[in-house]
């Protein structure tokens, strides 16, 4: 149905080219039915590039979806541009401070060859999962 994205979102044209309706948060607030807020903890390498792969199926839903991009305090995002993270992604506490999340998507890639509990940001991920 519809994806709620900020103005000038980098993948807006691509989403529209694939038949996804895009609205700004201001436009979405005027709708009769509220958006569902889906927290997306995207720890994939090159997060910016991977966002379309998440938004496209969400945009095919019968519901209006507002993605809430979440970043970790304890993870270094080496392969994603810092301005993109700072402009679009929020820390988990900020994501839930204004309004609860209706769902959570957790993405990642097995780029390290160590057990989960040894990954430096694992405790923070567990806190977010506990919330969900």
How should these model regions be labeled?
Residues 128-132:
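Catalytic nucleophile loop
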């Amino acid at each position: 149905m519809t994806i709620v994205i900020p103005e000038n979102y980098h993948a807006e044209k691509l989403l529209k080219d694939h038949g996804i309706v895009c609205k700004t948060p201001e436009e979405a607030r005027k709708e009769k039915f509220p958006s569902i807020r889906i927290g997306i903890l995207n720890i994939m390498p090159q997060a910016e590039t991977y966002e379309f792969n998440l938004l496209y199926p969400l945009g095919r839903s019968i519901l209006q979806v507002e993605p809430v991009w979440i970043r970790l305090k304890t993870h270094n995002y080496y392969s994603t541009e810092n301005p993109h993270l700072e402009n679009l992604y929020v820390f988990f506490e900020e994501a839930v401070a204004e309004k609860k999340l209706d769902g959570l998507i957790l993405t990642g890639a097995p780029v390290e060859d160590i057990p989960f509990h040894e990954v430096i940001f694992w405790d923070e991920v567990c806190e977010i999962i506990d919330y969900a």
